[in-house]
Amino acid sequence: MFVRPGAEHFMKIVIISDIHSNLAALEALPEREFDQLWCIGDLVDYGPRPHEVVQWVKRVSAVTVRGNHDNAVGFSVDPQCSPPFKRLAAETLRFTQDVCTEDDVTFLRALPGHHELKVNTTRFYLVHACPTDPLFGYCPEQSDRWDEEVLRINADLLIVGHTHTPFIRSIGKTTIVNPGSLGQPKTGRPLACYAVWEDGTISLKEYPYPLKETAEQIRLMPISPDDQDALISVLETGALPTGGH
């Protein structure tokens, strides 16, 4: 938890990332009253309900930035996933593009690579991966790369996603916040992750959701049973897929 010294009253802002077409997790979000919701990218791929997720985010999110999977669906390019996810990404990309409407694709294409804004006196920089590589830069919490990344921006809080693991880390005058993944967390627990900024304080949160519902929908996706098993395993274990995918 990070508390900004001398912070005045701030809006309540819910921050989500890496939904990956998991509508059941999104609809189970426990926050019902907030001033704004921000989405840090990767609305689509892997999961069974991309169209509904895109429309939800389009309707609810005040600020959304583009993730590597949004970019892949929007422009028919490689999302450049890590080896354990390459096959799953390729298989579900085809499904996602078949299911998404022209309106969905137009929305994904138009998403910015990053967004800067100020809430009262606090400066925010929102980007899916990292400032120097907005779509693909992979920076875990303890990466030395963050020392350089924070020098490239002028912000009190740098909000990122991409790694699917939540963390809060301060470097100099900048605090880096990763809310984790709402739709495909890699925490070792089957709990959806997000963050809340309220009254000058940011905190990481997680919650259970009807995973069985998402698993049943994955079974209906036109991909191989092995790939279905791998996707469900990731959700159930909060870990990398098995079976060499």
What is the meaning of each model-derived region?
Residues 1-10:
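N-terminal amphipathic/basic-hydrophobic helices that include classical n-h-c signal peptides
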Residues 12-103, 109:
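Core catalytic region of metal-dependent phosphoesterases/phosphodiesterases
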Residues 12-20, 123-130, 176-180:
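Active-site-proximal beta-strand elements of phosphoester/diester hydrolases
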Residues 17-19, 41-43, 68-71, 129, ...:
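Active-site metal-binding loops of divalent metal-dependent hydrolases
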Residues 83-87, 121-153, 185:
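Active-site-proximal segments of metal-dependent phosphoesterases and phosphodiesterases across multiple
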Residues 113-121, 169-171:
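Short acidic-hydrophobic surface loop/beta-edge motif
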Residues 140-177:
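Anionic-ligand binding region
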Residues 169-245:
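Acidic, His/Gly-rich catalytic cores of divalent-metal-dependent hydrolytic chemistry
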